[in-house]
From Swiss-Prot:
GO MF assignments: rRNA binding; structural constituent of ribosome
GO biological process: translation
A Pfam family annotated for this UniProt entry: Ribosomal_L27A
Source taxonomy: Bacteria, Bacillati, Cyanobacteriota, Cyanophyceae, Acaryochloridales
PANTHER family (alphabetical): 50S RIBOSOMAL PROTEIN L15, LARGE RIBOSOMAL SUBUNIT PROTEIN UL15M
Comp. bias (Gly residues): 23-35
Listed name of the protein: Large ribosomal subunit protein uL15
Native organism: Acaryochloris marina (strain MBIC 11017)
Cellular component, GO annotation: cytosolic large ribosomal subunit
HAMAP family: Ribosomal_uL15 (MF_01341)
């Protein structure tokens, strides 16, 4: 092999099939489409999902509004406005909120949302938070620390 005359590997390229050029050519008369039927007519093939006139699967199955994510994370959420009930400079964790009675059910790691106003400086330790929630916590003189890596 030389760089000035590259050739494809032998057997890797096939000749184009010429159909309808007589029986001796191998693809004469019906051109490989068989005898009769829908698949031998012009305008074939049928569209994807076509089942010969039967009500197709995509019409038999009901329309679903959404689908559930397999690995969806479930968070225990709290809005920033609810944190005003806590003492200044206190640590805010899921356990401390459960002890104070602000959160009643533990649905997973804590996520802080940004609805409401915060006037107390707090040290928030949560798995996740929205950007507006972090801005409000730091704006009130507190700090946010992520517990998830």
């Amino acid at each position: 092999m030389r760089l000035n005359d590259p050739k494809p590997k032998t057997g890797s390229q096939h000749r184009r099939r010429r159909v309808g050029r007589g029986i001796a050519a191998g693809q004469g008369a019906s051109c490989g489409f068989g005898m009769r039927g829908q698949k031998s007519r012009s305008g074939r093939p049928t569209r994807p999902g076509f089942e010969g006139g039967q009500n197709p699967l995509y019409r038999r199955v009901p329309k679903l509004k959404h689908f559930t994510l397999i690995n969806q994370k479930q968070y225990t959420t709290i809005n920033v406005g609810k944190l005003n009930e806590l003492k200044a400079k206190s640590d805010v964790t899921l356990e401390s909120l459960m002890a104070e009675g602000i959160i009643t059910s533990n649905d997973g790691p804590l996520k802080v949302l940004g609805d409401g106003e915060l006037t107390v400086a707090l040290n928030v330790q949560a798995a996740a938070a929205t950007q507006s929630a972090i801005a409000k916590v730091e704006g009130a003189g507190g700090s946010f620390q992520s517990t998830e890596s």
